[in-house]
């Protein structure tokens, strides 16, 4: 396996600028069950805001790059000179910065929006980061550079209360007809075509999904519902890819085994942060209960015998706005 790529490890492009956004100050963070969380928006966003979480997000960026055969976006999107690109929930900013590197030195603009400002201090001149709750009115930085050629949204299930409202907002800020919206989501319901699901993993998945349902930010992934919402809230030409994510290297082909190795690594880094706050705050489980569940799930993830044939599904949706839509 290749090393995990981080935004801070990328070479500095000529003309790089200092980011205007600082990392969260100590008073903006609070500690809970051994992890750091951002004070705002405490009652909504349930994932940590520490370095360990940043590393986890970068593992998924690497996984998606492998799935896309070393590309940064799907073939539906065209990013070229003078393109404007928006990344919703940009995390560490790795994807945004990689996009800027790919197009350098052509003029373009890449904007990353997130509730957590954990991106590098030194960034390409074509990159901007803005602190934003993307369900609230968008920031001036986001609005003034619309319409966009590409709006990217990855792994935002569990962070959004109203997908229809967000889809309408995205459609309103996308270039009519030519602009593309891309959404990547993992269905965390484990599957196996020829055997049972490992019990601890099934329990982990069931309980986290129940907690996030109660929290009002479901992580469930319904293909038909997503397609219907996109079509009913401003989009046309909706396309979907369904990709198997083996949770270990049991696939018969080398590409499947490589995806399995990376997803196994990502899953190992995800069971605890994805369950800690939901089970503690929403389901009122004790730290000991959560720790024991995660240790049991982790043992299964690390066991080839338990994971043989087990997988999740990754769904990639691409969509354009209707020809008649105008901002």
From Swiss-Prot:
Q: What happens when the gene is disrupted?
A: Impairs the ability to produce TeA under the DMSO-added, TeA-inducing culture conditions.
Q: Which GO terms describe its biological process?
A: killing of cells of another organism; methylation; positive regulation of secondary metabolite biosynthetic process
What is this enzyme's EC?
Answer: 2.1.1.-
Tell me the SUPFAM superfamilies matching this sequence. Answer: S-adenosyl-L-methionine-dependent methyltransferases
One Pfam family cited in the UniProt record for this chain: Methyltransf_23
Predominant localisation class: nucleus
Q: Which compartments does it reside in?
A: Nucleus
User: Quick one: a GO cellular component term?
Assistant: nucleus
Q: One GO molecular-function annotation for this sequence?
A: methyltransferase activity
Could you name the domain of life of the organism this protein comes from? Eukaryota
- InterPro entries, alphabetically? SAM-dependent_MTases_sf (IPR029063)
Which chemical reaction does it catalyze? Answer: L-methionyl-[protein] + S-adenosyl-L-methionine = S-methyl-L-methionyl-[protein] + S-adenosyl-L-homocysteine
> Which UniProt keywords are present, listed alphabetically?
Methyltransferase, Nucleus, S-adenosyl-L-methionine, Transcription, Transcription regulation, Transferase, Virulence
What is known about its induction?
Expression is induced by the presence of dimethylsulphoxide (DMSO) or by the deletion of OSM1, a HOG1-related mitogen-activated protein kinase.
Q: Which family does it belong to?
A: Belongs to the methyltransferase superfamily. LaeA methyltransferase family.
Function text: Secondary metabolism regulator that controls the expression of the tenuazonic acid biosynthesis cluster. Methyltransferase that performs automethylation. No other methyl-accepting substrate has been identified yet.
User: Under what name is this protein listed?
Assistant: Secondary metabolism regulator LAE1
């Amino acid at each position: 396996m290749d090393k995990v790529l981080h935004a801070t490890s990328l070479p500095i492009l000529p003309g790089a600028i200092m980011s205007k956004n600082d990392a969260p100050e100590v008073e903006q963070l609070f500690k809970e069950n051994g992890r750091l969380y951002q004070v705002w928006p405490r009652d909504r966003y349930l994932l940590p805001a520490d370095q360990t979480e940043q590393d986890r997000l970068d593992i998924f960026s690497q996984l998606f790059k492998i799935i896309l055969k070393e590309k940064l976006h799907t073939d539906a999107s065209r990013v070229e000179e003078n393109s404007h690109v928006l990344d919703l929930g940009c995390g560490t900013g790795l994807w945004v910065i990689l996009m800027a590197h790919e197009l350098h030195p052509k003029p373009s603009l890449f904007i990353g929006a997130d509730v957590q400002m954990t991106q590098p201090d030194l960034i390409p001149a074509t990159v901007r980061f803005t602190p934003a709750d993307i369900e609230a009115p968008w920031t001036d930085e986001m609005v003034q550079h619309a319409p966009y050629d590409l709006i990217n949204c990855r792994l935002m299930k569990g962070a959004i209360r109203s997908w229809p409202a967000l889809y309408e907002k995205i459609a309103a800020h996308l270039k009519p007809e030519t602009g593309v919206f891309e959404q990547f989501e993992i269905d965390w319901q484990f599957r196996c075509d020829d055997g049972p699901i490992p019990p601890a993993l099934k329990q982990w998945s069931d309980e986290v999904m129940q907690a996030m349902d109660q929290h009002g930010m479901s992580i469930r992934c319904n293909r038909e519902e997503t397609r219907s919402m996109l079509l009913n809230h401003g989009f046309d030409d909706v396309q979907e890819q369904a990709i198997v994510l083996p949770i270990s290297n049991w696939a018969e082909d080398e590409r499947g085994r490589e995806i399995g190795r990376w997803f196994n690594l990502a899953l190992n880094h995800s069971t605890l942060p994805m369950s800690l706050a939901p089970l503690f705050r929403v389901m009122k489980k004790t730290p000991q209960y959560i720790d024991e569940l995660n240790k049991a799930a982790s043992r299964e993830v690390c066991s080839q015998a338990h994971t043989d044939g087990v997988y999740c599904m990754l769904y990639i949706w691409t969509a354009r706005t209707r020809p008649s839509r105008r901002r």
